[in-house]
């Protein structure tokens, strides 16, 4: 059990394997900001103005120190009766400057919350919209928990980057430029001293960031693996307990969890030392500038005054702080880019191709007995076939399915179906039997184009199904899948899922046809009983009866029943079989069953072995041949 799950999910990376790196970080950042600007450009312009105002207010407040000391405090110390009026007025002015800066910072934060959450909502919507367009094979090849991790963890990494990191970087850049210009004008000598220390800070930050960045990327990917493993184990919890593999499953989780711990520990170990290192280097820069400034003031070098030194030290702090913040935000951005890489990788997955142009429409017969399109639901369906010459023809949907020389493989190098030839005429019941892995379910997956064939043709009412739009093709099919899935909602809503515009009366009629009405009425709230957790409060037989009712309400001309009665007890099977016989009457039906007794009345039984049809005929004909079907039937070897 555990081994099977490990094969499906991404296995742990070997210790000696190189750590992943973000590909094209500049392109990723451009795409992220493109998503922001597409919907929130005016907001971003206001935020930029707020950031500029806030940064300039802080710089202006630092510059005020020089005037405060040289023009007010020092002269007042030399007065017998100092006048505090000018000083008070100056303090009020600088207080107003601070207030404007605080207001701008508050407005910036408020707007960025709206921008960030709106952008994340849009990304999740785009992800879900695109995910629904992906082919089935994508979900066969990717652990579902890993896909869920993209929606949660990876999208959330963008939250801090958009709400804090990028605004902080912009603010830091504006602050650095304005403070640098002010420092140069105030004292180029002290500016040189400051820049030497800044160069050392940048060198240390770059080294630390380069070491932590690769581990942040690994952390996001390892987190996806852990989520994938948890999701799989939750789905298979009953199987784990049946085979008492709890310890083996726990060992698999610990291995992945330890891998996540190691990558997260390495990432945060480096990230957490950036601020202390840059802060201490900033303190050293402050002390060196204080000593140099004091010496210059005492020596009268360059007209340096006490006010100049105090103002420059304030600017020095204002200069070092954004550099430290840039270093800290760099790791947040790297982690966000790692998440963005996974987000855009999913969004860039090619959608399910559909080159069909034949559509399914409601139809009726006009007074000349010609088939014409109508907007009303008449119970008559037609294929609308546009032609190159601009004309359109309508062909009544009959339910005639034909396979001609069909080959198929899930991967190009391995063919699993060979030279399949069969047909289902309107109203016929075609049954597939054979051992596990013979290709029965694969054939039904080809009818609804979950997968496209490698060679040959499948025709629906004489039309190559590749010419039919997939949505219209699937609307013409009623499908009961091998694994019944029920959605969170009422029983009525789950039945109506087969045709969303169906009335309550039509849903109840479908339930009666599937012989589900009896047990539904015995539920606490009948048809309004809430189902949760994939219908866990229902038996397997009841869940399959609802799936059959869901197919019945769609009222399709063609039915695909993929092992619909394989997990139902004998009594329930009898109920289902009676309902299905009524449902299949007049419809082309393709049936796969574990119990051969359920397909005795089929018009044609196809026996598959290793992807080939080795026998075909009615039940009596195949029994008379005494071949594979005879062995399966008399030996009760179906699916064993």
Q: Model-found features: residue ranges?
A:
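Helix-loop-helix
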Residues: 75, 182-196, 266, 270-341, ...
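Transmembrane helices of ABC transporter permease
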Residues: 39, 43-56, 60, 97, ...
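An intracellular "coupling" helix at the cytosolic face of ABC transporter transmembrane type-1 domains
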Residues: 38-41, 136-137, 153-162, 166, ...
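Membrane-integrated ABC transporters
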Residues: 1-58, 73-94, 108-112, 116, ...
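Short intracellular "coupling" helices and adjacent cytoplasmic loop segments at the cytosolic face
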Residues: 13-20, 117, 125-149, 153-155, ...
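Juxtamembrane helix-loop junctions of ABC transporter transmembrane domains
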Residues: 18-26, 49-50, 57-73, 97-144, ...
């Amino acid at each position: 059990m555990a081994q099977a799950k490990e094969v499906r999910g991404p296995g742990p990376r070997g210790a000696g394997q190189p750590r992943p790196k973000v590909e094209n970080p500049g392109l990723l950042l451009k795409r992220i900001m493109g998503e922001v600007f597409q919907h929130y450009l005016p907001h971003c312009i206001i935020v930029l103005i707020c950031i500029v105002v806030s940064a300039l207010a802080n710089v202006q407040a630092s510059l005020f120190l020089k005037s405060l000391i040289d023009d007010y405090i020092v002269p007042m110390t030399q007065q017998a009766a100092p006048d505090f009026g000018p000083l008070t007025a100056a303090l009020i002015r600088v207080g107003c400057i601070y207030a404007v800066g605080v207001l701008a910072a508050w407005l910036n934060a408020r707007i960025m919350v709206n921008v960030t959450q709106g952008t994340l909502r849009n990304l999740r919507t785009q992800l879900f919209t695109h995910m629904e367009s992906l082919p089935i094979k994508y979900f066969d090849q990717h652990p579902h928990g890993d896909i869920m991790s993209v929606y949660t963890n990876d999208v959330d990494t963008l939250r801090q980057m958009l709400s804090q990191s990028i605004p902080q970087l912009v603010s830091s850049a504006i602050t650095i430029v304005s403070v640098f210009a002010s420092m140069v004008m105030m004292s180029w000598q002290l500016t040189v001293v400051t820049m030497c220390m800044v160069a050392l800070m940048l060198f240390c930050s770059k080294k630390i960031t380069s070491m932590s960045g690769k581990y942040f990327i690994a952390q996001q990917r390892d987190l996806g693996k852990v989520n994938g493993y948890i999701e799989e184990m939750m789905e298979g919890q009953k199987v784990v307990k049946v085979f008492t593999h709890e310890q083996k499953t726990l060992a698999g989780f610990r291995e992945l969890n330890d891998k996540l711990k190691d990558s997260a520990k390495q990432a945060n170990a480096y990230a957490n030392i950036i601020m202390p290192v840059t802060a201490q280097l900033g303190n050293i820069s402050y002390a060196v500038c204080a000593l140099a400034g004091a010496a210059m003031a005492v020596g009268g070098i360059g007209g340096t005054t006490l006010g100049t030194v105090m103002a420059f030290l304030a600017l020095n702090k204002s200069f070092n702080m954004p550099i430290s913040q840039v270093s800290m935000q760099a790791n947040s951005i790297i982690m966000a880019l790692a998440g963005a890489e996974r987000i855009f990788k999913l969004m860039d997955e090619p959608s399910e191709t559909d080159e069909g142009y034949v559509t399914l429409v409601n139809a009726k017969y006009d007074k000349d007995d010609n088939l014409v399109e109508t907007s009303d639901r008449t119970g008559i369906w037609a294929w609308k076939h546009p032609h190159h010459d601009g004309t359109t023809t309508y062909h009544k949907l009959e339910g005639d399915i034909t396979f001609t020389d069909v080959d198929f493989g899930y991967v190009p190098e391995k063919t699993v179906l060979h030279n399949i030839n069969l047909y289902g005429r309107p109203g016929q019941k075609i049954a597939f039997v054979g051992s596990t892995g013979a290709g029965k379910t694969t054939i039904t997956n080809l009818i609804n184009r979950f997968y496209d064939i490698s060679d040959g043709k499948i025709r629906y009412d004489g039309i190559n199904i590749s010419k039919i739009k997939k949505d219209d093709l699937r609307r013409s099919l009623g499908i009961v899948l091998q694994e019944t899935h029920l959605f969170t909602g009422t029983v009525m809503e789950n039945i109506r899922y087969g045709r969303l515009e169906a009335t309550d009366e039509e849903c109840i009629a479908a339930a009666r046809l599937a012989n589900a009405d009896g047990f539904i009425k015995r539920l606490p709230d009948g048809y309004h009983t809430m189902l949760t957790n994939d219908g866990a409060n229902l038996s397997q037989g009841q869940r399959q009866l609802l799936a059959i009712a869901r197919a019945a309400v769609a009222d399709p001309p063609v039915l695909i029943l993929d092992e619909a009665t394989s997990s139902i007890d004998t009594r329930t099977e009898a109920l289902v079989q009676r309902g299905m016989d009524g449902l299949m009457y007049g419809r082309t039906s393709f049936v796969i069953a574990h119990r051969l007794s359920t397909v005795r009345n089929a018009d044609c039984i196809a026996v598959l072995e290793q992807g080939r049809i080795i026998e075909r005929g009615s039940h009596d004909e195949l029994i008379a041949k005494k071949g594979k079907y005879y062995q399966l039937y008399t030996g009760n070897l179906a699916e064993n």
